[in-house]
Amino acid sequence: KYFKYNLIFKRPSGTSRGVLTEKETWFIVLEENGRKGIGECGILRGLSADDRLDYEEKLQWTCDNIHLGEEKLWQELIEFPSIQFGVEMAFLSLKSENPFVLFPSKFTSGEKSIPINGLVWMGDEVFMKQQIEEKIAQGFNCIKLKIGAIDFDKELQLLRFIRDNFDENKIEIRVDANGAFSENE
């Protein structure tokens, strides 16, 4: 079986293809011998490769045919990578000692962190600058900016702001321009 759960963003988040306010998520639930396995199938509308009209129909088909097993389902779901992920996760969850901890580690036990980038969502120049300052104040040493929503020169100014105000040996800059520019640009 599966059920849907919409994750509502705390703040609208700009991408090169529009503003996101929620993330549609479906959870596949497997049950066997009194144990449960849970797998997440999530898409971002307008961004995910499997954002299709027949998505939920394929999810129902998957649940109806779960007896085919993980390997066969993987082949049948090649056009639905998020459902493949959910199936793989559900089977791993079913086999795990704790269905919510698939790969026990110092990270999952809270003993160790994983350094990641501080993501700066698209928005106007003031909002993006505010996020940059917040991420650096929070200790991020890699700042990733989603670009393509505002004037390119203003985005360049934001990059210059980081370089002019923060040590380039301590702050790494990454940009995410997915879908923001055409091949000619």
PLM regions: where:
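N-terminal capping/lid subdomain adjacent to the active-site entrance of alpha/beta enzymes
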Residues: 1-173, 178-180
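Catalytic cores of alpha/beta
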Residues: 182-185
